[in-house]
Amino acid sequence: MKILLLGCLAMPALAGLHAQDLHFSQWFNSPLTTNPANTGFIPDADYRLGANYRNQWSSIMSEPYKTMSIFGDAQVFRNRIQSGWLGLGGVIMHDVAGSGNLTTTEVYGSIAYHQMLGYSSLLTAGFNTGWVNKRINSANLKFPDQFDGKFFDNQLPTSVVLDQPNVNFLDMQVGMNYAYFPNEKTYFNAGFSVQHINQPRESFFIANPAGFDSHISPRYIAFFNASFKRSDLVILNPMAYYTNQAGAYEAVVGLNAQYNISGDGDEQLIGGLYYRVGDAFIPMVGFVYHNIRLVFTYDVTTSSLSNYNGNRGAWEFALIQNGFYNQYNGDRHQSLCPSFRQ
């Protein structure tokens, strides 16, 4: 019954292809997909490398949704631009959704300019553009006219014909960031971005079916995070995230804490809890070892979908490494946000 219900819900989406944008619960650990102005916005390092993986709905689907990404960004021309620098980076995302094997591959390049405003604030503007490919294996799909009264049978003939099961398009994003750090124990950061500013067309049909617009609506993203060093052992990080696209929205609020277990800040424990409004609680655990951070989250479903998945929504991990170009950079005191390292 679960599979039948999900199949019926999925079929109308094929016509308009208004698919949900790829996303992670750990939006803060996927900086370049959240806001292109995050490119090179690395408060405590010169460069950053990362990987994300998300597995969703494995409790109710034989083929769960799987999303993965790798990214990297760096600060450049830091010593050549007065009180500013450029950020350059890129991200590759890959997603496989459901039994129809709807596969999405995205490759983006990002650039951002960061300008200090005095000694305690920073303003950033960023832009990215990239190539997106979507393809689908229609042999694994079942359509309404293949329902025999009891079951869907994909061996039955269907009137649905996909004109182009493989589509490509160009996508663009813009964003801004502002950070305020009045002292070594306090840090605030807020950003706003607009994705799909060129509103590319995304459809497996050459002509739009009646009543459908296959252009991707702009997606608006706003976020806020802060960092407060409470002692030499504890740093608190409250965060909030909001996105809206074509009337669909997502809001996440929460808090995590870093606990210094080594004294010098090289080893830290991370724990936190987030809430996606109307959908899920998201507990988080993680560990920092020198410049490597590993974070795991689990979406505990609280919406009506919990009747089908038993509260088991998705699990996700992020692996991030921060680094410096040389030992001198690592020794300098350049962190803009609270740190255990002196």
Per-segment meaning from a language model:
Residues 1-4, 342:
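Short, Lys/Arg-enriched, disordered terminal segments
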Residues 3-13:
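Sec-dependent N-terminal signal peptides
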Residues 14-19:
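Sec/Tat signal peptide C-region and signal peptidase I cleavage site
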Residues 20-342:
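Subset of outer-membrane beta-barrel
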